[in-house]
Structures are given as C-alpha cells and as structure tokens.
Amino acid sequence: MAKGSGKVLAQNKKAGHDYFIEDTIEAGMVLTGTEIKSIRAGKAQLKDSYVRITNGEAWISNMHVSPFDQGNRFNHDPLRARKLLLHKKQIGELVGAVKRDGYTIVPLKMYIKDGYAKLLIGVGKGKKDYDKRNDMRKKEAKREMERTFKSKNQY
C-alpha cells in the first residue's frame, strides 16, 4: 500500500497552502482507547497542529481529538501532546531538515492503515505571500482553461 493511502480521517488542507512540502514521512501514534474511537468516528482536526522534536522523540501538539461520547470518566484531554512512532534514523532526518533555514514539520493527514492510525507528516518551507498569490493565479488560469475546453467540446 502506498504511503498516505488508507481511509483518510483528517486532513490539513492549509498546510499545502502555507508550505512548500518537500518530503513526507509516515508515522504511527501513541493513543488511548477513547482517542482511537473518536478518531475512527472522524472527530479529529489537524488544523493548527505541529510536530516538535524533544529529547530524540517526535511529538504532535495542538491536534484536537474530541472526547469520545461514551467515554465518561476515562476520556482524554482533547489537546494533549501525542507521541509519534518513528525510527531514530527518521527522527535524525527530521532534525536535520528543521535545522535548515525556514523548514518546519507539519502534519498533512491522518488515516487508518491495516487497522492502525497513521499520520503523514511533511517537511516544508513556509510560503511568502507572493508565492501564495502566484499559486492562486496558476490555479485560476488552469480552471479558466478547463472551462474554455469544456465549453468548446459541447456542441
């Protein structure tokens, strides 16, 4: 199965708008029982979340996982930091990438693969405002071209 494939449960669409994603890595997550139940129900958000590396371990912060409806007193904190499961070599690559100018680690999407929740994280460089405007112009031009082809093909 390809990297990033499986049932997508949450996506960070803003990451593609705010960053030039250069490399992606698949990571597992350490979750509690109520967290995985909420995630499978589609109650997770990657918006404004980020990955940081402390003491040789990767952690995702600010990822919101809503409390499980039937979780009662065993429920989890919705915004707690969750450990990512990566090999040491992968963590070393991420540390090296972050030390370069302007690079950051952003979560791209969360999905289920072979029964396990996985997180696709990307190493990206922040876009400037003019880069975002150029991307918007290109998308608009592409849409316009498709519209004209579509109208010419109808007779």
Curated annotation (Swiss-Prot):
| GO terms under biological process | trans-translation
Alphabetic keyword roster: Cytoplasm, RNA-binding
> Per the record, which residues fall in region Disordered?
127-155
What Pfam families does the record point to?
A: SmpB
Instruction: Give yes or no: UniProt keyword Cytoplasm.
Output: yes
Q: Which Gene3D superfamilies match?
A: 2.40.280.10
Spans of biased composition, class Basic and acidic residues? Answer: 127-149
Q: Which GO terms describe its cellular component?
A: cytosol
Q: What InterPro entries does the entry give?
A: SmpB, SsrA-bd_prot, SsrA-bd_prot_CS
Localization, UniProt: Cytoplasm
- Which terms in the Gene Ontology molecular function aspect does this entry carry? RNA binding
Superkingdom assignment: Bacteria
Record has RNA-binding as a keyword: yes
Q: Which PANTHER family match?
A: SSRA-BINDING PROTEIN, TMRNA-BINDING COMPONENT OF TRANS-TRANSLATION TAGGING COMPLEX
Q: Tell me its family.
A: Belongs to the SmpB family.
What is known about what this protein does? Required for rescue of stalled ribosomes mediated by trans-translation. Binds to transfer-messenger RNA (tmRNA), required for stable association of tmRNA with ribosomes. tmRNA and SmpB together mimic tRNA shape, replacing the anticodon stem-loop with SmpB. tmRNA is encoded by the ssrA gene; the 2 termini fold to resemble tRNA(Ala) and it encodes a 'tag peptide', a short internal open reading frame. During trans-translation Ala-aminoacylated tmRNA acts like a tRNA, entering the A-site of stalled ribosomes, displacing the stalled mRNA.
Descriptive protein name: SsrA-binding protein
Q: What is the lineage of its organism?
A: Bacteria, Bacillati, Bacillota, Bacilli, Bacillales
